[in-house]
């Protein structure tokens, strides 16, 4: 394993950043019911892509496998090569990871919810966002900001781990099933989500 915050990149593959193992507080007392209770969780080290998957990266998968192109690939507000790919289902995201694994000889997969939250927090403890407790400056103009589609992948400042866009732009998929009360019964170390959902 490389040192935390180090980069790893294969030819034609995503830039990966090492997220160090550690404890953190997961959840939000001010959030939705399924984000409570806040609880202490240990996560082993793992790698995560520095930025969201771009249309250009996903297009390589579509061409190589014959997979169906996402419906917004033809929409000029969503089809710039450097915008993050949108409108793909969970199964398509999993197939993309499997394709990357075969292409680069690794074990690419979607992160678990606990891995995603640890990565998104960027090592900042006790704050609502990686930059502190204040809402994003763009919040008042949220609808206007994304009226013409998402911003280019990687345009946000990096968080404490060197990752970009995890708390802005578009949503990401996690590997876990959903269960509304899972936080109340999840294991303390490396929770993988409920068995079904």
Regions found by a protein language model. Name each.
Residues 19, 25, 29-30, 68, ...:
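Functional-site microenvironments in short loops/helix caps that host divalent-cation chemistry
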Residues 1-6:
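N-terminal pre-domain segments of enzymes
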Residues 8-71, 88-91, 167-168, 175:
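A short glycine-rich, aromatic-capped structural motif
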């Amino acid at each position: 394993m490389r040192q935390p915050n180090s980069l790893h990149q294969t030819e034609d593959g995503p830039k990966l950043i090492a997220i160090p193992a550690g404890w953190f507080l997961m959840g939000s007392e001010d959030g939705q019911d399924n984000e409570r209770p806040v609880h202490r969780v240990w996560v082993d080290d793992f790698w995560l892509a520095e930025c969201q998957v771009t249309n250009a990266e996903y297009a390589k998968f579509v061409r190589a496998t014959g997979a169906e192109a996402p419906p917004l690939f033809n929409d000029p507000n969503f089809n710039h090569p450097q915008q993050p790919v949108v409108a793909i289902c969970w199964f398509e995201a999993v197939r993309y990871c499997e394709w990357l694994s075969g292409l680069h000889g690794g074990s690419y997969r979607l992160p678990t919810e606990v891995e995603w939250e640890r990565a998104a927090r960027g090592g900042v403890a006790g704050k609502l966002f990686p930059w502190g407790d204040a809402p994003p400056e763009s919040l008042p103009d949220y609808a206007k900001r994304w009226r013409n589609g998402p911003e280019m992948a990687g345009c946000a400042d990096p968080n404490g781990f060197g990752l970009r866009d995890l708390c802005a732009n578009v949503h990401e998929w996690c590997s876990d099933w959903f269960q509304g009360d899972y936080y109340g019964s999840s294991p303390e170390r490396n929770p993988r989500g409920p068995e079904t959902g």
